[in-house]
């Protein structure tokens, strides 16, 4: 046990560095970072188990920061562990700096997650805890680890905390400990201006162990963490009552603590100088680590060497006794695409693509041992039950299955899947109706930003949902998701792969592409209704190029018809009428424009030549295909919300028929 005086000195060191980072950048959030310094100091100097020499060690504890605006606290603490230099701290929020305003995942530097909008970070941690339980059920003690999360008042207020709290408690995630930095201050008001809820009772109702402490007392923090580590059968919430801007002084040297002004702005001028002096630092040279604090963290580094050596020795014995499991561990954490015998999948002609997806999922359930699939209370409708029937759902104390029943909580489910991917060792997929992807957009964006290969399964892909009416009929959703194919990630690649297959066989290819995509998230968009298969003799492997010819390979067609999903079969029906008039037709299925645009210009021009007359049909907004049809093209799409009626009636009323394809193309060619 470290002396309280030393622990307070180390926490003050973090406060000085955090306040100075914000001051130098003239931008940032010092108050929360100063208040939370005591907890992260105790955690990193006494509890968190990791290998400083091997940051990617799969058996490490993981720390997820929810309030990304408190990044100065995390960077400063990691600097004490040797992961950041003082110069890098001083470059906070600057171009090219490794210390951006909100943390971005960087395992080598100890940053486990990109901290997105409040509420997501701790939900990532719930997903990581689920992944750890799943892996421990298969691999044993080598995955015996603790997942820590840090949440603020704002994160508690975000609606997603309801889903994360409920799910973690329901599953009894006793490998999960969350610190709630309860300082009663947020950006524009005190928390009592917006809430009077009893947070402790709320989490207790979700079956959490709740411990309330003075969050600035290192002895109380240590005791709480020790108690939490011993808890079984439930996650633990440590409510730390902290002081916003702890140690901060105003220009007149009066207290600047518990003040909203310190939340999101530099302390400034004399207030900053007085604060650094009050904390025992040098305002003229604030970027330094005190000698005794260096010694504290050097001591922890030596402790970690011994702890990790014991862990590695135990792993070596386990590997010797379990060579097959050891090989699986290595493969699963490699991030490589799994081997799947795609040839065993037998699709039924004319099936809905959601049903075709179920057949694929049934094979994946048996062939991909580290895959976890989740559904937001729709498994029998989104057809993820094809996977569930080959395994069973997680329950408290039983993670031998591979299915997460997330309940009606789409954003929570998505963020949990991101957390699973961040943990590593598992392949995560989640499903709901396409219209409910609206609830998932924040997580989709974060998956793209972090380059996480999560598989998003969205069924009931268009107005053909039918009788449920416009609230459940996606129209604009496809355009929104396809924008992610146009948005580049920081590696310069399409930030997402979006696939909407045209029939059952193309669905198998889409799933193959999704499973082989290990560098970005994938969207799989499937139909509710049955779809006629593409013309006989089609080479489905060409779907891997994003767009390909499925009928009419004439070198000089009079018109090219383009669509994705179920509209391709409508084009084929319309083409039969057009051919009777002697019109030469080429039909192109385009499951992914992003993938198509990544092909060579030569290939693109061979499918849709520059200047060709192109007609596009989409059950979404016309913009879905405008990039493919070009200046000489025309798109018939849906430009309004849908209606409640049987889907075949809607096809007729909205113009998604062979006859209207014929009429539209004839008008275009006139």
Locate the predicted segments by residue.
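Thiamine diphosphate
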Residues: 1-146, 295, 301-525, 530-532, ...
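Small/polar loops that bind or transfer phosphate-bearing groups
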Residues: 65-66, 152, 213, 240, ...
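Conserved beta-strand elements of the Class I
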Residues: 148, 372, 560-562
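Residue-level marker for buried hydrophobic side chains located in beta-strands
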Residues: 149-150, 178, 374, 615
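Short acidic, Gly/Ser-rich segments with clustered Asp/Glu that frequently serve as metal-coordination loops
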Residues: 154-160
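Non-catalytic, alpha-helical, charged scaffold/linker segments
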Residues: 276-307
């Amino acid at each position: 046990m470290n002396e309280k005086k030393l622990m307070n000195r180390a926490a003050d060191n973090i406060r000085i560095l955090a306040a100075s980072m914000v001051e130098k950048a003239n931008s940032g959030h010092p108050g929360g970072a100063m208040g939370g310094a005591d907890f992260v100091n105790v955690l990193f100097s006494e509890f968190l188990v990791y290998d400083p020499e091997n940051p990617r060690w799969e058996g490490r504890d993981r720390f997820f920061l929810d309030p990304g605006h408190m990044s100065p606290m995390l960077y400063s603490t990691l600097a004490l562990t040797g992961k950041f230099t003082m110069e890098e701290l001083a470059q906070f929020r600057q171009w090219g700096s490794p210390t951006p305003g909100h943390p971005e995942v960087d395992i080598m530097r100890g940053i486990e997650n990109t901290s997105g909008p409040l509420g997501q970070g701790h939900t990532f941690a719930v997903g990581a805890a689920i992944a750890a339980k799943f892996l421990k059920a298969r691999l044993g003690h080598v995955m015996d680890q603790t997942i820590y999360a840090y949440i603020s008042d704002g994160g508690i207020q975000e609606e997603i905390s309801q889903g994360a709290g409920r799910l973690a408690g329901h599953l009894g995630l006793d490998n999960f400990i969350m610190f709630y930095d309860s300082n009663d201050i947020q950006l524009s008001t005190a928390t009592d201006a917006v809430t009077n809820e009893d947070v402790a009772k709320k989490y207790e109702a979700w079956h959490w162990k709740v411990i309330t402490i003075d969050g600035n007392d290192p002895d109380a923090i240590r005791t709480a963490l020790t108690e939490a580590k011993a808890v079984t059968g439930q996650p633990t919430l440590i409510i730390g009552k902290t002081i916003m801007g702890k140690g901060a002084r105003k220009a007149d040297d009066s207290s600047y603590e518990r003040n909203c002004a310190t939340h999101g702005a530099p302390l400034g001028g004399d207030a900053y100088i007085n604060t650094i002096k009050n904390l025992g630092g040098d305002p003229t040279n604030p970027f330094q680590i005190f000698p005794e604090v260096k010694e504290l963290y050097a001591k922890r580094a030596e402790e970690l060497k011994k702890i990790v050596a014991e862990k590695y020795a135990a792993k070596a014995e386990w590997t010797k006794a379990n060579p097959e499991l050891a090989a699986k561990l290595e493969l699963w954490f490699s991030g490589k695409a799994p081997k799947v015998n795609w040839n065993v999948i037998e699709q039924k002609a004319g099936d809905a693509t959601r049903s075709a997806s179920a057949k694929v999922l049934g094979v994946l359930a048996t062939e991909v041992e580290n895959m976890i699939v989740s559904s937001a209370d729709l498994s029998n409708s989104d057809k993820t039950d094809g996977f569930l029937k080959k395994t069973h759902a997680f329950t408290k104390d039983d993670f031998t299955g591979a299915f997460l029943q997330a309940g009606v909580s789409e954003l929570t489910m998505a963020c949990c899947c991101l957390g699973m991917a961040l943990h590593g060792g598992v392949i995560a997929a989640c499903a709901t109706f396409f219209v409910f992807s609206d609830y998932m957009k924040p997580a989709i964006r974060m998956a793209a930003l972090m380059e996480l290969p999560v598989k998003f399964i969205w069924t009931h892909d268009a107005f053909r949902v039918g009788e449920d009416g416009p609230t459940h009929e996606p129209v604009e959703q496809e355009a929104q998701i396809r924008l992610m194919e146009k948005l580049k990630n920081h590696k310069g690649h399409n930030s997402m792969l979006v696939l909407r297959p045209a029939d059952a066989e193309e669905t198998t290819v889409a799933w193959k592409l999704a499973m082989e995509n290990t560098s970005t998230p994938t969207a799989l968009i499937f139909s509710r209704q049955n779809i006629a298969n593409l013309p006989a003799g089609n080479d489905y492997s060409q779907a891997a190029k994003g767009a390909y010819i499925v009928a009419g390979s004439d070198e000089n067609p009079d018109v090219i018809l383009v669509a994705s999903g179920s509209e391709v079969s409508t084009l084929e029906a319309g083409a039969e009428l057009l051919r009777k008039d002697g019109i030469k037709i080429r039909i192109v299925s385009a499951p992914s424009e992003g993938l198509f645009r990544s092909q060579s210009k030569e290939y693109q021009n061979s499918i849709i030549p520059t200047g060709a007359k192109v007609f596009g049909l989409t059950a979404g907004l016309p913009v879905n295909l405008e990039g493919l049809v070009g200046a000489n093209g025309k798109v018939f799409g849906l430009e309004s919300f849908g209606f409640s009626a049987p889907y075949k009636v809607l096809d007729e009323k909205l113009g998604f028929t062979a006859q209207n394809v014929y009429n539209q193309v004839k008008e275009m060619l006139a």
